[in-house]
Amino acid sequence: EADRAHPQKKSRPLAAGIVSTQVAWLAAVLLPTLALAAAYSLHQGLFWVLLLYFVLQVAYSFSLKHIVLLDILVVAAGFVLRVLAGGVVIEVQLSPWLYTSAGLLALFLVIGKRRQEFSTLGEAAASVRRVYAHYNLALLDDMLRIVTTSTLITYILYTVEARTMVRNGENLGLLTVPIVIYGLLRYLYLIHVRKEGSAPDEILLTDRPLQATITVTALAYFVIIYLL
C-alpha cells in the first residue's frame, strides 16, 4: 500500500497490480532458493554470504525498514555483503578499508536518496515510509555530512594501504583521490541544487559527469595495476 502512494514506486509491477500477490510470494520463495542452490554449487562460502544477505533482506522487508537509523544501515550492510561475496568467489582477502569504504559509500547514497525523497514528499513522506515520521531534513543533512567525510577518509586509507598501487616507492592510488572527491561533491550538488537523488541508479545512468568520474577511476585503476 505504501508503494502505491509513492510517486515512483507506484509503477512497480506489484504496486500497479500487474503481478498478483500469489505470484510475488512464489517468486520470493523460488528465486532465492535457486540462487542459494547455485551459490552452494559454486562456492560454499558464497552460499553462507548469500544466505545472510537474504535473511537480512527479509528482516528489512518485515521489520527493520520501520526502525529509525537501522533502515539505512541495513541497506548499506547489504552492499558490503555483495563486496564480500565477490571476494569469496575470487578467493581474495580484500582490505578491511575496502569493505568500510563500500559500506560508507552505500550509506552516502542511501542517505542522499532518503533526504531527497523526504524533501520532495514533504508532509506525505510518513505515509510512504512509516519511518520518515522519525526523520527531519536537519538530521538527514547532518548524517550526510558525517558520512561524506567518513567515506573520503576511509577511501584515502584504502589507497594508502593498497600495495598493488605502489610503483617505484610511490603510491599511485592517491592520484584517484581527487576524482573520488569530485564524484562525491557532484552527487551532493545533484541532491541540493538540482533536487535529484531519489533514484541513485537513474542518476548514474543519466548524469554524464558522474559517468565520466566512474569511467576515469576505473581506467586509472586498470592502468596502475596492469600497465605500470
Describe each model-derived feature in a short phrase:
Residues E1-A15, L70, I111-S119, R186:
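Acidic (Asp/Glu-rich) catalytic motifs at the cytosolic membrane interface
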Residues L31-T33, F54-Q57, V75, F79:
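Residue-level recognition of pore/gate-forming positions within transmembrane alpha-helices
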